[in-house]
Design a protein with these regions (language model features):
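A detector for short, charged/polar N-terminal pre-domain segments
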Residues: 1-6
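Short basic helix-loop element that most often maps to the first helix and adjoining turn
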Residues: 9-27
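Conserved hydrophobic/aromatic packing and binding residues within compact polymer-binding modules
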Residues: 11, 25-26, 36-39, 65
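Helix-turn-helix DNA-binding elements, focusing on the entry/boundary residues of the two helices
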Residues: 11, 22, 33, 48-51
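Recognition helix of helix-turn-helix/homeodomain-like DNA-binding domains
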Residues: 31-44
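Short, conserved catalytic or interaction motifs in soluble domains
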Residues: 41, 60, 70
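DNA major-groove recognition helix of helix-turn-helix/homeodomain DNA-binding modules
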Residues: 49-64
Length: 70
C-alpha cells in the first residue's frame, strides 16, 4: 500500500471519528478545505508540516496518520 493511500485512509477515519467535516477540519487546521479533499482522495501528498497541523486538530500523534492499519 502506498503511503499516500495510508494517509488518506487514516485521515478520513480519524476525521470521521471526531465527527468533523472536511471543512471543519480545514478551518481548525487553518488550511484550505479543498486540500483536505485532495489528501483524502490520494490526489496530493501531505507535507510534514501539514501532517503536524492535521494531527494537532485530530489530537493524535502525526505518526498515526502514517501508520498502516489492518
Amino acid at each position: 500500500m502506498k503511503l499516500r493511500e495510508i494517509v488518506a485512509r487514516n485521515l478520513r477515519q480519524l476525521r470521521n471519528a471526531k465527527g468533523l467535516s472536511q471543512e471543519e477540519l480545514a478551518d481548525r487546521a487553518d488550511i484550505n478545505r479543498n486540500y483536505v479533499g485532495l489528501l483524502e482522495r490520494e490526489q496530493h501528498a501531505a507535507t510534514v508540516d501539514m501532517l503536524e497541523k492535521l494531527a494537532a486538530v485530530l489530537e493524535v500523534d502525526p505518526i498515526d496518520l502514517l501508520r498502516a492499519r489492518d
